[in-house]
């Protein structure tokens, strides 16, 4: 039987279905029907675990329990790269569901059969809700335009809509993946649209909330530590005093700026390429289609999406994603500094700086009993390093848009989404398992501050830089205190030293 089917496909003898079959096809409602209909191979193969579907290259076996079709299967054959861990990110698939629903709704306004449009919208909603995730097997490493993933989405929505209308999977009747689901669209404008939708949602649902949580926790610690005076450090060496609260206020400001930078990049992310079709001209769309689709997407997501003012830029360049990735890269730099400072200040417990007492979350060593490590700081710094690497990849991808189309799209969005998720999740983890539980080791802080030679800086206005420097160097050489040395050198009295060297008076301008 299957040999006969293969020969039939090879000879391309496609038979026209009888008029009665066309008339009785479920849900046609006057919709355009292809001139030629593939042979009834799907029914013939249904007794097994697969059905036969066709693309322009010929027939392929498609698993009966999957909604995708021939083009998706062909992509799995051609791009066996990386395995399941390299699949197209779920946020992109969900974003496609949102886009396809919006497009179907607008296409209905322009004359698409309401029965077909409604079925597409229902199927697209299921995609957007994640109900059909198992039907998207394709990896990131495919065509750089994301065409295979766009067709994966089209096929899944088409077959699910056909099923809803009582039709036969793979028949493309009454809902065709290209003619109906992809109507007025191209992979070249749908994929960048899905990229922006996915990135915006991830930023708003994961990244910004995580950073805000971290900001608030650091701000609370800054206020809690406002009266604790400690020695400062520059070049990792002793410097003049400040409060632990002041030190933490620097971290607060860094995270505040991170949020500001990310928000500043979002207006370009809100611009959608939909309506540009193949090269940005809008071929095969209707006037107003782009604006209406953007408005529908905005309504569905609650985010201020608009149509891109220049579709040529929206298809050929992805500077908006590079900009957002750059903001996240800067955020990673900030978080690397913050996490490193906190773990170094908490080093010890007896042989390090030991100014901070960090929460103990789990055993730290398989050989050293009782050892506890700053694991949340380590996780955060690894995340920061990964985000920096992701930005390099995004930068390379963004710089390689050639002529009318950038063909690094899947790789770019994979890394942008990865960075947003990692930074958001790590911020929450770092906050809940480290920052909120940080305590100040005031005994250690006071000891280190009182032993610091840099308190001598307070004497500059009274005895001059050169004498103050001699006090510090002599005290360091002899192992004596600043006060003892200053008196021994005859530069000032004990009373003068006590009056002039007061750490609490060294915290700001007079």
From Swiss-Prot:
One of its GO terms (cellular component) is cytosol. Catalyzes the reversible stereospecific interconversion of fumarate to L-malate. Experiments in other species have demonstrated that specific isoforms of this protein act in defined pathways and favor one direction over the other. It comes from Macaca fascicularis (Crab-eating macaque). There are 2 substrate-binding sites: the catalytic A site, and the non-catalytic B site that may play a role in the transfer of substrate or product between the active site and the solvent. Alternatively, the B site may bind allosteric effectors. The active site is at 235 (proton donor/acceptor), 365. This is Fumarate hydratase, mitochondrial. Pathway: Carbohydrate metabolism; tricarboxylic acid cycle; (S)-malate from fumarate: step 1/1. The modification N6-succinyllysine is found at residues 61, 66, 80, 115, 122, 223, 292, 467, 473. Gene3D superfamilies: Fumarase/aspartase (C-terminal domain) (1.10.40.30), Fumarase/aspartase (Central domain) (1.20.200.10), Fumarase/aspartase (N-terminal domain) (1.10.275.10).
């Amino acid at each position: 039987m299957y040999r006969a089917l293969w020969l039939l496909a090879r000879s391309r003898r496609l038979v026209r279905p009888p008029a009665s079959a066309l008339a009785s096809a479920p849900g046609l409602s006057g919709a355009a029907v292809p001139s030629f209909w593939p042979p009834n191979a799907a029914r013939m193969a249904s007794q097994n675990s697969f059905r036969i579907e066709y693309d322009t290259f010929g027939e392929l076996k498609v698993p009966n329990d999957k909604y995708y079709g021939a083009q998706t299967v062909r992509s799995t054959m051609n791009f066996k790269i990386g395995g399941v861990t390299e699949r197209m990110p779920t946020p992109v698939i969900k974003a496609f569901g949102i886009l396809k629903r919006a497009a179907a709704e607008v296409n209905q306004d322009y004359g698409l059969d309401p029965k077909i449009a409604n079925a597409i919208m229902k199927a697209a909603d299921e995609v957007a809700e994640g109900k059909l995730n198992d039907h998207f097997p394709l990896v990131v490493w495919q065509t750089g335009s994301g065409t295979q993933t766009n067709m994966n989405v089209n096929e899944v929505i088409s077959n699910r809509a056909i099923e809803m209308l009582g039709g036969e999977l793979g028949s493309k009747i009454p809902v065709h993946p290209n003619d109906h689901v992809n109507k007025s669209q191209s992979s070249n404008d749908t994929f960048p649209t899905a990229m922006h939708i996915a990135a915006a949602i991830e930023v708003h649902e994961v990244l910004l909330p995580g950073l805000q949580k971290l900001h608030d926790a650091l701000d609370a610690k800054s206020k809690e530590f406002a009266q604790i005076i400690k020695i400062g450090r520059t070049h990792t060496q002793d410097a003049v005093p400040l409060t632990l609260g002041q030190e933490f206020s620097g971290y607060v400001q860094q995270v505040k700026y991170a949020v500001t930078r990310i928000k500043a990049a979002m207006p370009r992310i809100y611009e959608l390429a939909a309506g540009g079709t193949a090269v940005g001209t809008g071929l095969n769309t209707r006037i107003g289609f782009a604006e209406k689709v953007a408005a529908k997407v905005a309504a569905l997501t609650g985010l201020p999406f608009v149509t891109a003012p220049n579709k040529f830029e929206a298809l050929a360049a992805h500077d908006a994603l590079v900009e957002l990735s750059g903001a996240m890269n800067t955020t990673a730099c900030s978080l690397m500094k913050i996490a490193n400072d906190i773990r170094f200040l908490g080093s010890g417990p007896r042989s390090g700086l030991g100014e901070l007492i960090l929460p103990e979350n789990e055993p730290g060593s398989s050989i050293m009993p009782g050892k506890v490590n700053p694991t949340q700081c380590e996780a955060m710094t690894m995340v920061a390093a990964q985000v920096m690497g992701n930005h390099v990849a995004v930068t390379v991808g963004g710089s390689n848009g050639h002529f009318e189309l950038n063909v690094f799209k899947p790789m770019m969005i994979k890394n942008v989404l990865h960075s947003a998720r990692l930074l958001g999740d790590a911020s929450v983890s770092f906050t809940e398992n480290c920052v909120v539980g940080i305590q100040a080791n005031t005994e250690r802080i006071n000891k280190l501050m009182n032993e610091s030679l840099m308190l001598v800086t307070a004497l500059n206005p009274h005895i001059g830089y050169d004498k103050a420097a001699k006090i510090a160097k002599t005290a360091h050489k002899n192992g004596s205190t600043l006060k003892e040395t200053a008196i021994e050198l005859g530069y000032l009295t004990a009373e003068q030293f006590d009056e002039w060297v007061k750490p609490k008076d060294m915290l700001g301008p007079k």
